[in-house]
Amino acid sequence: MPKVNENSFKKIEKDVLKLLPPRPHKIEISEGQKFAKSIRQALSKYVTSVNHPIDFFSNQMLDVPFRQPLYADFLIQAKTIHQKEPIGSFLFTFKQEDSGSSIDIIFSPVSFYKISGLDAEFAPSVHRISFVWYGADNCIEDTVPNLAELIEEGKFHQFLTPVGPLVENITSTFVTRIKSVVKGEVLNNKSPPENVKLLLPSDLFIDLDEPNIDTLAPKHLLSFYYACVTYPVLHNVPVMALTFIKSNKSIRDLFCHLKVIYSDIIRTKYIAMQNDFYINKMSFGALCKLGSSSSETVPRRGNYHFRGSSLPTVEVPDFVADPGPWMTIL
């Protein structure tokens, strides 16, 4: 007796059954109650029941969806952003001219410090980790050939654009692909999306918001975060510094506060440049808005560890990226 192929038999059986008309449903039409019951029985074979209909509608229809962030992808040289750069670090892209190249130049707070010309006195922890990640064998300084000229003339920030917190870093031997949130809530690209905290070096962070006190004065709903690039003179050599500032004050009050903070540094720079001073060097720096968070949010302090080195950080859990233009500080 020949052996029957079970799969072939099931396929033939299925094809034959398709040729038969479907079994009819018995519907009672003589009485209204019996008609409704028979209709429900017929429909129950084709639909699924919802055990908690109220929860179903509230979860699927009433919950407010998150605001979709705007992502940006960049291809960069592998060594210009270290593979251990923490997720949440704020990034800047640098471009002097549109050369048509698909390779971008990206700076993090740590890599920016490495090319700034500052010593360990200004930010000890950032200085230490910058040499661990971007040491003497790194080519990060070569990405900007006229770096010294831009710093001396106070023009580096003119080619610098904030592109938001880092949310993905895919490293390879030669080219690295990174993703950042340019605008909107800082969420990663997973499904479902997860919140990413803004991470800033505490050595480079200044909180200008007054401590919470009992007062009848109205409070601002948001605190804004800014990047401040300045061009001081260190040991008669022009350098630049990147500082992150948190403030819920108006722009006018913020600039007045910055003039007080940097008054001695500005005076020292102008004294050092009095023999080589002209109008193009009058700019001391520039300020740029990066985004905001709730005014009730207090940035948390943390530490990022790497091979025995520790980088004190400031974490902002509800940061929303919304960068603005650079504003000159004279």
UniProtKB/Swiss-Prot annotation:
Keywords: Capsid protein, Host nucleus, Virion
GO CC terms of this entry: host cell nucleus; viral capsid
Keyword Phosphoprotein: no
GO MF annotations in UniProt: DNA binding
GO BP of this protein: viral capsid assembly
Protein localization: Virion; Host nucleus
Functional note: Structural component of the T=16 icosahedral capsid. The capsid is composed of pentamers and hexamers of major capsid protein/MCP, which are linked together by heterotrimers called triplexes. These triplexes are formed by a single molecule of triplex protein 1/TRX1 and two copies of triplex protein 2/TRX2. Additionally, TRX1 is required for efficient transport of TRX2 to the nucleus, which is the site of capsid assembly.
Family matches, as HAMAP family: HSV_TRX1
Subunit text: Interacts with TRX2, MCP and capsid vertex component 2/CVC2.
Family, as annotated: Belongs to the herpesviridae TRX1 protein family.
UniProt-recorded name of the protein: Triplex capsid protein 1
Lineage: Viruses, Duplodnaviria, Heunggongvirae, Peploviricota, Herviviricetes
Gene that this polypeptide is encoded by: TRX1
